[in-house]
Each structure stands twice: as C-alpha cells, then as structure tokens.
UniProtKB/Swiss-Prot annotation:
Keywords: Phosphoprotein, Secreted, Signal. The keyword Phosphoprotein applies. This is Lung adenoma susceptibility protein 2. Might play a role in cell proliferation. It is found in: Secreted. Residues 1-31 form the signal peptide. Residues 248-268 are annotated as: Disordered. One of its GO terms (biological process) is negative regulation of cell population proliferation. The gene is LAS2. Its main location: secreted. The keyword Signal applies. It holds the Pfam family LAS2. Residues 255-265 have a biased composition (Polar residues).
C-alpha cells in the first residue's frame, strides 16, 4: 500500500482492524531505515499491509483449526512525521496533564497550514499498527470544509469528554450569540494564558451567503401568498364552486315560425273548434259522440214509437186526404225507409244484446235459488 503523508491522517475510536489487533502485542524500534521492514514469524515484509495480511490469514486458520496460532509483528521503521503523530495525536487519558505546550503549539500551527479538507484524511496500515491494542483515541480533529487564503486558514481542535473532566485548567467550549442570532462556537484554554481556538467566522459567513441566495431565488408570489393548505385558503370562498347560471326567459314555440305556418296553425285550430262545437254533425265511420248501450236502446225505442204514431195517424185520416196525399206519403215513406235502414240494424243488435243479458240474468238467478 502506498504511504500517504501523515498530515492527512485521522483515527476512529472504534476500528475493526484495531479490534483485530487487540489480541497481539506490537513493539517498535527507532531505527533510521527509511524503507522500513516488518518481521512476522521469522519473515521479512517490506510493507505493513503484507505483514498484516499474513497475520489475518493465520488468525482465520486459528478459528478453523485450534492448533494454528498467530505470532507477533515487529516494526522496524520510524518517520519524523510519524513521531509527531504518535506524540501529539495519540495520548492517554491524562494527556493534558503532562502536555508539552511548545510541541503542542507547534503541532497545531503545522496542522493549520497543511489540512485543507476533512474528506481527504485517511489512515494507512502503518498508522493502524501504531494504534493501541484497545483502539482508544482521545483526540479528535475537526477542520474547515472550505478553502480560503493562507491567512484565513484556521484549525479547530476539540477535546474528548474524559480529558475535559480530568483537566481542571481547561475551559469547555461555549457559544456566543452574534448577529442574526447565529451561534458562534469558541474553544478556549488557559494554557500559558493563550487561546487555543477562535470563532468560526468563515463558516458563518458562508452559511449567511447561502441563506441570502436561497431567499433571493424564491419567487415573489411565494413570499406574499400563504400556503394553499392553510386555514385561510380552506375557509375562503371558492370561486370555482359558485359558477353563475344564466336563466333565459321562456320563448313561445311559434315565435320563430314563419307567418305562413302561424296562419296554418290558426286555421287548423279553428276547424277543430268548429268540429267539436257542431251538435248537428253527421255520424261517420271514425265516430262522433257515442252513447252507452242503454241510451242507444232508449233512443231506438223512441224512434220506433214516433214511427208507429205517424203510421197510425196516416190510417185514421180521411180517404180524400189519403188520395191527395198519396204522392206525398209515398215520398215520405221512401224517406222513412231510407232513414229506418240504419235504425233497424241497430235495433236488431240491441235486441240481440238484450236477449243475452236476459239469459245471463236468468242463469244467475237459477244458480242462487238452489243455494237458498
């Protein structure tokens, strides 16, 4: 694995690799070999990743076969920057009690100029091998996530909770209220009467600019109008529900017709009225006023009686008058015969119906008498 510079290195408190190394012991020597060498089970490895891979293989075999065991990894390398990493970054729980203030200030000033982006920080296998067996790490570094000029590049340090509790000369971070109610975190310490941290002004300025840009991009209508789901919108009048309906006055049917059609309609109406009001209307096949069967029989009987009276009156008259009136009587008889033809037919039908009614009445009377 390629060795990256120690200025971009960071350690996590819980690491799977450090947990794996908890069962082994590491020992280092201060040799001046720049290439470095790693000894594991009487074998020499040029990189720490190779030695660690061999150790992992033996560890897996030990899980399968109880007879297999892991050995020790001996580190024979020392870098100048690595010593700074071990002396300043990794500290026990009492790190700030035995702190060399000059080295600590030099380390922080060095880190201010070198660290640019927190995403670029990583640990190599060599750094992982130098960590303690329990994987503890009490110092965490937080750097700015943006780039500015060299004068504005600043480093922020944040201490663990355990170190704050044990160090009586340490003042924890406090927040100061700036303009626009922005919280400005500040880290201060009384080491040699100097401040170790300062305000994060650049981050606040960047946040302000982002907020201003977001508010400027919002449309004006969204600023003026409320949300459509608010109570005001729900309780307001809904124009789309109150659709105005126009009622037209009734128009007569014949208003748009031509004068010829109106005249025809009037003439037809007059004909119908005349036909209904005409009492002397002759009987036709399509009808007229039809009476009931009893009324028809009555009219037929009255007609027969009138004919008989006329016939009797004609017999009682004098013979002279009869001779004189022969021509007139013949003519009247002919007219009577012609007028009696439909009457006789209707009388025959009426007599037939009467006979049937009489039979029905007799039958019903005959059925009732035995029951009595």
């Amino acid at each position: 694995m390629a060795k990256s510079k120690t200025k971009h290195r960071l350690c996590s408190q819980e690491s799977s690799v450090s947990a794996l190394l908890a069962s082994c012991t590491l020992s280092g020597s201060n040799s001046s070999n720049s290439d470095g060498s790693f000894h594991y089970k009487d074998k020499l490895y040029r990189s720490a990743s190779q030695a660690l891979q061999a150790y992992i293989d033996d560890f897996d075999l030990g899980q399968i076969y109880p007879g297999a065991s892991t050995g020790k990894i001996n580190i024979d390398e020392d870098f100048t920057n690595m010593s700074q990493f071990c002396n300043y970054i990794y500290k026990p729980n009492n790190a700030f009690e035995n702190l060399d203030h000059k080295k600590h200030s030099n380390f922080i000033s060095c880190r201010r100029h070198t660290v640019n982006d927190i995403d670029s920080m990583s640990l190599t296998t060599d750094d992982l091998l130098r960590l303690p067996a329990d994987g503890s790490f009490s110092y965490t570094y937080v750097g700015p996530s943006h780039r500015t000029s060299k004068k504005n590049k600043k480093c922020r340090g944040r201490l663990g909770s355990l170190d704050i509790e044990k160090n009586p000369h340490f003042q924890g971070p406090y927040t100061s209220m700036g303009k626009d109610n922005f919280v400005t975190p500040v880290i201060r310490s009384n080491i040699n009467g100097k401040q170790c941290g300062d305000k994060i002004e650049l981050l606040i300025l960047k946040a302000k600019r982002n907020l201003e840009q977001c508010t400027e991009e919002l449309p004006k209508s969204m600023k003026k109008d409320d949300s459509p789901c608010s109570l005001d919108k729900l309780e307001a009048d809904r124009s789309w529900e109150n659709i105005p309906v126009t009622f037209k006055s009734p128009v007569p049917v014949n208003s748009d017709d031509s004068p010829q059609q109106t005249s025809r309609a009037k003439s037809a109406k007059g004909v119908l009225e005349d036909f209904l009001n005409n009492d002397n209307q002759s009987c036709t096949l399509s009808g007229g006023k039809h009476h009931g069967p009893v009324e028809a029989l009555k009219q037929m009987l009255f007609n027969l009686q009138a004919v008989q009276e006329r016939f009797n009156q004609n017999k009682t008259t004098d013979p002279k008058e009869e001779i004189k009136q022969v021509s007139e009587d013949d003519f009247s008889k002919l007219q009577l015969k012609e007028s009696m033809i439909p009457i006789t037919r209707s009388l025959q039908k009426a007599l037939h119906h009467l006979s049937r009614l009489r039979d029905l009445v007799d039958d019903t009377n005959g059925e009732r008498s035995p029951k009595m």
